Amino acid sequence: MTTIRTLVVAAEAFPLAKTGGLGDAVSGMVQALGHRPGGVDVQCELLMPAYRGTLDMVYRPRTVARLGGLPGGPASLVRGHCPGSGLSVLLLRNDALYDRPGIYVDDSGQGYPDNARRYAALAHAAARLAQGLPGLRPPHVVHAHDWHAALAPLLIHAAGLHYVKTLLTIHNLAFQGTFPAELASALGIPLACRHDDGALSDDSVNFLKAGIRYATRVTTVSRAYAREILTPAFGCGLHGLLRARGADLSPVPNGIDTALWNPAADPHLGGLRFDALDMRNKACCKAALQAELGLQPRADATVLAMGSRLTGQKMADVAIAALPALLEAHEHLQFALIGRGEPALETALRALAARYPGRCAVHIGYDEPLAHRLHAGADLLLHGSRFEPFGLTPLYAMRYGTLPVASRVGGMVDTIRDPGPAVEESCAGQGTGFLFDGSEPADMQLAVARALRALAKPAVCDAMRRNAMQADFSWRASAQAYAGLYASLASAPQRGRVPAPTLPLLANAA
């Protein structure tokens, strides 16, 4: 069996670094690829920055290379193994760039002003590894995730490394990594690529555009999103380029770690475990969640949860506007939130909690164990979104029998089965949640009210919970798709569609 060496390049991977779904998706994918999906032997190694505390988390760290001439200064590559999975990881260490309180933003929520250099350095490190470093075999495939790694395909292409194929996965097209064009030289972008058909867009360097332009193949994380991003409404200005790459663009849906998100064996539930065949402890999880968050201890309450970045994309503004009327109209309704994001939205949510003490609980920040307890104890998950590449959070909720009330966009169209009008006649069918159109408070209010009516019918509620908990959202099928894609890339001859300038990378000085 031929082994396909794959370098996975990303800004996040759980548990080393995580701010949202990207960290979960990267780690889940890499772990699943280690099980020889479809009989393909994939040897994955992860490349990511050595953020503050990351080096302390890996096992047996040792420096394996030193890299000079990177944007932001010299760095070292430290190899270690991730806790739990044993996954091999290369950490790019440059304390001046990465030893900071946050991954992307400072304590005030502002993005670091040198983020362009921080993630250009990551891409250059990937390109050096693709060239081959002493004692480190070059990969057959470099798999870059989102804008943070998206310069890697350009650099590999420009260096003439035609034997190394590149794959870019778009997790969120809205975040493109745009920076002033005058930084192009400092970022090590070759002169031949500094144009509107290359790395530039509207007089800015656009990391994600560069990746889409120069990657051998491009994937997105859901079928619906792959269709949506070809349109002006969802293409974020890149729909034309994506349509031009249409033959090389394909969806590979995400999965979730079903061992980590498993109510029957979750260590974060304090022994209150349950499954689709015996859900009695879910009520106990609700009582425990109410006590933990300061909600009224009512067994008859319906807990509506929200676990999300607090941004306009996630319709946090709409939820804030919709919730008062919902709480006033449904006296048994309670609301619990975990999230952080835009300061104005955080302030508005704190004010909502103060207005409805005992019925509204707001936890600003992210707490992984609490997130598990939130999904276990809630009845419904509110997950509005103006666009949604995939939507991992509804899948976590469904694993715990918490039914999502979500926008009918992106990946949620593929993963959530709405029972339709039949639910009003006490027929759950194959339903696993509730989808709604629109982005007005009234749209969200009507959807939540519809879900509350369904939950008031025990037979419907129980059937939908079982459907949700028994749905297969594992990485198995996705890992097979990626492994097959790697195999086709590794065996493919060099294509001549895009002329490749053979320019040197930044000096590989020690």
UniProtKB/Swiss-Prot annotation:
Pathway: Glycan biosynthesis; glycogen biosynthesis. It comes from the Bacteria. ADP-alpha-D-glucose binds at residue 18. It is an enzyme of class 2 (transferase). GO terms for molecular function: alpha-1,4-glucan glucosyltransferase (ADP-glucose donor) activity; alpha-1,4-glucan glucosyltransferase (UDP-glucose donor) activity. CDD domains: GT5_Glycogen_synthase_DULL1-like (cd03791). Its EC number is 2.4.1.21. Gene3D superfamilies: Glycogen Phosphorylase B (3.40.50.2000). SUPFAM superfamilies: UDP-Glycosyltransferase/glycogen phosphorylase (SSF53756). It holds the Pfam family Glycos_transf_1. Keywords: Glycogen biosynthesis, Glycosyltransferase, Transferase. One of its GO terms (biological process) is glycogen biosynthetic process. Belongs to the glycosyltransferase 1 family. Bacterial/plant glycogen synthase subfamily. This is Glycogen synthase. It comes from Bordetella parapertussis (strain 12822 / ATCC BAA-587 / NCTC 13253).
